Design a protein with these regions (language model features):
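HotDog/MaoC-like acyl-thioester-processing domains
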Residues: 53-106
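Active-site beta-strand->loop segment that positions catalytic residues and contacts the acyl thioester
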Residues: 33-55
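Residue-level signal for the start and early helices of compact helical domains
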Residues: 1, 7-8, 33, 39, ...
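Ser/Thr- (and often Asn-) enriched beta-sheet segments in non-cytosolic proteins
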Residues: 3-5, 49, 76
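Active-site helix/loop of acyl-thioester processing domains in fatty-acid/polyketide metabolism
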Residues: 2, 9, 13-34
């Protein structure tokens, strides 16, 4: 069993760890290619236990219950080509998230 703590500087939505950071933290801890499913908001600044479940998965848990489940595997993606420079500049200037965002602290 391993204890992991998500520092508040890695905040995602309010009072919750950033999902990508949490998944990366689990993968780094296990030193493996894994698929992770978040099943509850990951609490911040709280010791979480990462332990095998006996059925081929690892479970990250808080005192309240499971936070994430991980299993060995890789995600296969067809990565699209990047945009042209002019398109990227235009998109960066017109992205509405710079003016208003559902999770501005994320």
């Amino acid at each position: 069993m391993t204890t992991l703590t998500i520092g508040s500087r890695f905040k995602g939505p309010p009072e919750s760890g950033n999902g990508g950071y949490v998944c990366g933290l689990i993968a780094t801890s296990l030193q493996a290619d894994i698929k992770v499913r978040l099943v509850a908001p990951p609490p911040l600044d709280t010791p979480l236990e990462l332990a095998p479940d006996g059925e081929g998965q690892w479970v990250l848990s808080s005192a309240a219950g499971p936070v994430a489940r991980a299993l060995a595997g890789r995600i296969q993606l067809d990565v699209p080509s990047p945009p042209q420079y002019v398109q990227a500049v235009w998109a960066s200037q017109h992205y509405p998230g710079f003016r208003e965002h559902a999770f501005p602290d994320c």
